[in-house]
Amino acid sequence: ILNEKESELSFAIVQSQTLGIRMGGTSGEITWPPVRLQNPDGSPNYANVSAYAALTGEVVNIPDVYYVEGFNFEGTRRFDAKTGYRSKSMLVVPMRNHENDIIGVLQLINAMDPDTGEVIAFSPESQRLTESLASQAAIALTNNRLIRELENLFEAFIKTIAAAIDEKSPYTAGHIRRVAELTMSIAKRLNEAKDGPFADLHFSDDEMKELRIAAWLHDVGKVTTPEYIVDKATKLETIYDRINT
C-alpha cells in the first residue's frame, strides 16, 4: 500500500499457501521492510518490480523471475535460498482509486496448474481476473480510508468545540479533556476486570468510541451559555437567579 507521502510501499497482507505464511490484517504484524519508490540519489526505483508498477501504472507479468532483464530480484533469490522456496512466475498489478490515482499494488507469485499443481506463467485470463480483483480491492481500501478520514474530521470538530468551551472560562479550562481521559481510563480498567462485580462487563470497540465521543460532548451546551453563568460560583437556586437566566 502506498504511504501518505507516496514515498514507499508498505506490506498490508502477505500470504503464502506453500510456506504457510500469513501476515497482516488479523494475522499479526508484518516485519518485512517497505519498498522505497526512489533510490538514495532520488531517481525512480524501477529496478524493483513493485515500485515500477506503482510508479508507471503498468501491469508486469513475468514467466520466470530468475530469467528476466530490467528488474533486480536479488532479494527474491535470498528469500528462496533461506526458505527453500522457488519464486518463478509473478504478476504485479497497480491498484487505482476512483480518481485513477495509484494507491498500491497487488503482487501474485507462482500461478499453479489446477490439474497438475505445477508452477506456470500467469495466463492472459488470469491477468484480467487479477486486474478486476485489484480494482475491487482499491475501492474497498479507498472506502475504508474515507471512513477513517471522516471519523478523524468529526473528532477534530468535537475537540475544537471542547476547546472553545474551555476558553469561555478560566475556571473550567481543561475540564472536558480531563473528563474524557478519566472516562476512557475507567472504561479500559472495567474491560480488564477478570473478577468482581464488573467481570461480565465489557465495552466493544464501537461502544468505546461512543463513550469517548459522549465524554467530549458532555458539556456542549455551554457553547451558548453566557459567561456570567459559566463563571458563577454558586448554584442557580434563588428566585433572583432564575429570573435573570
Regions found by a protein language model. Give the residues of each.
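GAF sensory/regulatory domain recognition
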Residues: 1-44, 67-68, 106, 236-244
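Metal-dependent catalytic cores of enzymes that make or break cyclic nucleotides
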Residues: 37, 42, 58, 116-124, ...
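Signal-transducing coupling segments at domain and membrane junctions
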Residues: 46-50, 59, 63-89, 111-120
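Catalytic cores of nucleotide-enabled group-transfer and carboxylate-activating enzymes in metabolic
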Residues: 50-53, 61, 83, 97, ...
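Signal-transmission/dimerization alpha-helices at domain junctions
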Residues: 55-59, 105-106, 128-150, 164, ...
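A short, aliphatic-rich beta-strand micro-motif
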Residues: 88-97, 104
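Flexible loop/coil segments at beta-strand boundaries within sensory signal-transduction domains
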Residues: 96-102, 111-114
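Amphipathic alpha-helical "output/dimerization" segments
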Residues: 101, 116-142, 209
